[in-house]
Every structure is written in structure tokens, then in C-alpha cells.
Amino acid sequence: MSKQRIYEYAKELNLKSKEIIDELKSMNIEVSNHMQALEDDQIKALDKKFKKEQKNDNKQSTQNNHQKSNNQNQNKGQQKDNKKNQQQNNKGNKGNKKNNRNNKKNNKNNKPQNQPAAPKEIPSKVTYQEGITVGEFADKLNVESSEIIKKLFLLGIVANINQSLNQETIELIADDYGVEVEEEVVINEEDLSIYFEDEKDDPEAIERPAVVTIMGHVDHGKTTLLDSIRHTKVTAGEAGGITQHIGAYQIENDGKKITFLDTPGHAAFTTMRARGAQVTDITILVVAADDGVMPQTIEAINHAKEAEVPIIVAVNKIDKPTSNPDRVMQELTEYGLIPEDWGGETIFVPLSALSGDGIDDLLEMIGLVAEVQELKANPKNRAVGTVIEAELDKSRGPSASLLVQNGTLNVGDAIVVGNTYGRIRAMVNDLGQRIKTAGPSTPVEITGINDVPQAGDRFVVFSDEKQARRIGESRHEASIVQQRQESKNVSLDNLFEQMKQGEMKDLNVIIKGDVQGSVEALAASLMKIDVEGVNVRIIHTAVGAINESDVTLANASNGIIIGFNVRPDSGAKRAAEAENVDMRLHRVIYNVIEEIESAMKGLLDPEFEEQVIGQAEVRQTFKVSKVGTIAGCYVTEGKITRNAGVRIIRDGIVQYEGELDTLKRFKDDAKEVAKGYECGITIENYNDLKEGDVIEAFEMVEIKR
């Protein structure tokens, strides 16, 4: 007979697993997690503790019910007495109203006389912001500006009313008046991250649904698993078995809601998947039992570990005859995911997304992990969260799918989403139903924003639409400035991209060195670089450290700075970072020349040469209406690829040169067909194919200079 586990015992008593774990730890019993089996003596000790408490609670509830009935009878008698007292008081108040009218008339005649205003007291403590002026500081101290200016003059500082004061000067003046000063830290309201707070310490925070991300390799069954959980078919509408966008769905299991994010499993969507891991509480790693660990599986593990998110492994396709779940477990141990049965802490759930076997076990494990994590949020706070996806709809305008992480989102709320803003016009849940409110961990699609945000952007709700508009516009302007800054200046890394658009191909260079001889030698060497069609323009040379004026010149001329045995000063460093100017520091002349030359070669228009990659012989032809002539071919040399250029050769003479229209193997489209295999080929705008023709495939390859 198998031993009872902690979570099973907790379920029996309607308690949380964490309560049982805490009690066991207080008994000095080592506990790893909620899946640990309980010994008989441990169960007896827990029974004494928890079953006694439940009996006492039942007794107290019956006593409280008796007390409530007695109190209700007493309250009825008291209410009758109170009504009589209220009637008597109302009669007395009528007489008082007449006296009040007479008093008001007398007060009108007694007008106050003009008296000189009493001098304001100097406060004991004053707060100030960075850059406060003499006039502003005088107002805070309740003194004349001239008095502050006089004190500054005695300290040897000549200042006027609009002069900014530094911290040291402010403290000197404050000491003279015996006032304590404190610098006020100004919070940048445009930084949306400041509105995201940890809700674990909030006394009003309540339990929220877990946000679960399903990750894994392409075609391992992520969307089919979601399909089984939601009982709806979404796989059929997807192209090539790859999820097109991150979708968010919410389901209910055992009275508790769970929110699922479906991230794309293809390697091209790595960034989007990483964003999904940042908002999730639990990761479901789907691994096919017949395929094992694949490249995207490893990427998903790394994303989850970086985000410090617990992983539950769903071993899918166990109903296939070639499935081998033990192999999957063995392979995952190399990445630190060790099953509980093998002494580890990772939960493995074998299942079949197609048949639905094991789905209930997976949902139960999600619930247990979420319970241990104690996920909380405060619905009373301002709504904040993350953009899951966004698009521009022809009929509705910009729309965004949001995940509410804290607070409650309402229709009509003023909102800032990334660099966009607006007022929520409509809100739709994952079932397509219009809703008015959305609490924590709820996915919704909204309309009413002025532009399309980026997936992964954060959103914050503000009480005032003007404030939301101001912050949104300010963030938008800041992003434009940043984009211009990033794309404006040339660097050796983006030299080819910057220069290839114009006909004139120049590289402006500023050289700074430790001695004049080095500067002249380096300038002469750079001028000797012989790359066709590219000019090196040395616009400034000098001896000494790189300074701020060098950076200003480089920024104005869209050039780069080369420092030979010299370093930039602090002002130049700050300016270079602000203006995004490329500075290259070297100690060997050869390294400078090599780096510049390799960057300049990218400026030239690339040269290509033709490379034959394969040949196919036409064995049979088929004429099909609306398609044209289909050639049944046999690949005799190399390979035929879908994107290759082709020549039709008949009796050694080239009949036609063009491109492939279709390449098929049996009835399926093929990317390439290798030597020794048959395929079907159609040529774009050419139907005069005959048996015995040779189709030669070629590619254009760039020549390295």
C-alpha cells in the first residue's frame, strides 16, 4: 500500500499544503516539498494537531449562533426607546434656530479692523529639489531673497535671485538659520516600472490565479495540449504547426482559475518567448516522448531558469508506439531537471494531449505548485500589467492583448501602454465576450489606444486622462529621440549599413595620439588603405587625451574617433555615450588599420558569382490546365533547391533561364531534393519542357574581397 503524500493529507482536511509543511518543520522533520510521503507516526502527530482544532472550531460556531439570537431580541427593545428620544430632541432644535439668526445679524455690524500681518516663522525643517534657486529657497525659509543674497555675499558667493544653489551652499545657509534640510527625491512618473510593486507584503492582497506559460520545441504538441485543456480547436488554423502569436486563455479547475500563455515554439520567436517567461508564474515544458530534448527545448529551459520560474515537465505523446518517457527524463537530467522519483524536485507528468490522458494530473500539479508559491495581488490597486500581443485592426483601430498583473482594469480607464496612451473603449475576454472589469491574472483585449504598442511593453492605469496623455506623449517623444540618436552616428559596426545608401562613400576619422610622430604615422597608414570606391577623410589630428570638443566634432561630421595610446577624459566619455559617438582605442597601429579596412570593405557593392548546385533529368511531362507543364524529374547530380535559379538545357544548348515555380516530392512541397530522388518541377513562365531535357540549378554566391 502506497504512503499518503503531504498534498493528499492537506486535501483531506481542506487545508493548504504549506500549513502541513510548516507544522512538520516545527516538529523538526525535514520536508523537501508537497510531494513528500508521510510516515504513520507523522500522520498521528498531525491528526492530534489539526483534527482537535477543527473540533474546537465547530463548538465555538454553535455557541456564537446562540449568542446572535439573544442579541437580536435585545436590539429590538433598544430601537423603540431611541425613536422616542429623537422626537423630543427635534422639538428643542426648533427654538435654537431662532437664536442663531439673531447672532448672525449682530456679527455683521462688528467688522474686523485692519491689522499688520505677523511675520511668518522660520520652519524647523525644509525639503528642496535639486537645482532650487535663491528665490525659491527664500520662500521656503519664509525670509526675503535679499537676506539670502546678503548671506551668500558674506560667504564669498555672488548670486542673484534666479541663481541655482548646490547642496553644500544650501546646508551652509540652513545651518545659519538653524533649519534642518532634506533633499526631495523626484520620482520620474514616465518610468512605468516604478508602479510595479511586490504584493506579498500588502495586507490587502488576496490570492490570484497562476499565470502558466507553455513552452517547448516546435510540433511537440504545445497548442494541442492547450486545445485539450480548453476543449476548443485552435491548432487547425495555424500555419505549418507554428503558433503565430502569443495567445492568452483562462480556464477553471476545481473552482480555481488558471491563465495560460501560449508562446511560439520556433527559434525565430526567441525574444517573444523570453518576454512570456517574464510575466509567468509556472512554466510547462512540453517534450515529445518519441522525440526527446531538442534545441528549442533547451532554449525554453534557459528562459525559465533565468526568470526563476518553476518548471513542470509534460511528457507528451505517450500513446505513440515509439514513445520512450524514460529517455526524456534521462536527457533532461543533464539540464538540472531531475524527476522526483529519482530524488530530484522537478515534477514530470506523462500525458497525451491528443487523447486527453493525464490532463487532470497536470492541472492538479499546477494547482499545487501555485499554492506553495502563494501568488497574491491587490484588486484595489491601480491596474498594471504587460502587453501580450498587439495589432492594427481595420475596423477597430489599434488593439492590444493585455495581461493584468495587479489591480483591476475597467472600461473607461485612462491608460498608458508602452509609448502609447488612450482611454479603454471596449474590453473583450479570451472567450470573445465583452466585459467591464478585469482583475489580476486576467487576459483581455482592449481598444481605444492611439497607436499599436510592442509585445512585452508594460501598461499602467492613471486616474486622470490628461496625465495619461502627457506621460504617453512624453514617452513617445523620448523613444523618437532615442531612435534618432541610435541611427544617426556612424560606427565601425554599422558602417556598411550607414554608407551603402549614398553614392559618396566617405569615412570621416579623428585621430588623437600620445606623440606627434605616432599621429602622423597612423594618418599616413590610413590614407594608404586601398579599397575601391571608398575614401578616408581625416578631419582632425592632435596630440593629447580625447576631449569633449573631439566628440562634438565627430558627432557633427558623423565620424569616428581613434585614440592611439590615449584615453578619453570623463567629459568626453559622458558626451560619447550621450551622442552615441564611436570611439576606438588602440596601442598597435596594425590593429587600427586592420579594423578600419575590414569595416570599409563592407562599403562596396557586393560581387556575386554563379555556382551550379545540381542537375535533374526530365523523365516524363504532364500538362495540367491552370498549372502548365509539370516535369517528373530524377536528380542526377548535387541537389535542387526551392529558391535556386534554373536553366533548361536541350542537346547541350540553353533553351531558357529563369526560376523554379514549384518543387514537390510526391504531393508535398519540398525545400530541396537530393541526388538519387525523384521530384516534380514547374518552371515560372515556361511550359515547353520535354523528356530528356536537363534542368540545371544554380545559386549566386557573394565573393569575399
Swiss-Prot record:
Residue spans of biased composition, Basic and acidic residues class: 41-58
Biased composition (Basic residues): 94-108
GO molecular function: GTP binding; GTPase activity; translation initiation factor activity
Compartment list: Cytoplasm
Composition bias type Low complexity, residue spans: 59-77
Record region (G3): 262-265
Cellular component GO terms held in the UniProt record: cytosol
Cross-referenced InterPro entries: EF-G-like_DII, IF2_II, IF2_N, P-loop_NTPase, Small_GTP-bd, T_Tr_GTP-bd_dom, TF_IF2_bacterial-like, TIF_IF2
Chain positions covered by the region annotation G1: 216-223
Keywords tagged on the record: Cytoplasm, GTP-binding, Initiation factor, Nucleotide-binding, Protein biosynthesis
Protein origin, superkingdom: Bacteria
Region (G4): 316-319
Gene3D superfamilies assigned: 1.10.10.2480, P-loop containing nucleotide triphosphate hydrolases, Translation factors, Translation initiation factor IF- 2, domain 3
HAMAP family xref list: IF_2_B (MF_00100_B)
PANTHER family: TR-TYPE G DOMAIN-CONTAINING PROTEIN (PTHR43381:SF5), TRANSLATION INITIATION FACTOR IF-2-RELATED (PTHR43381)
Function statement: One of the essential components for the initiation of protein synthesis. Protects formylmethionyl-tRNA from spontaneous hydrolysis and promotes its binding to the 30S ribosomal subunits. Also involved in the hydrolysis of GTP during the formation of the 70S ribosomal complex.
Name used for this protein in its record: Translation initiation factor IF-2
Gene source species: Staphylococcus aureus (strain JH9)
Lineage, top ranks: Bacteria, Bacillati, Bacillota, Bacilli, Bacillales
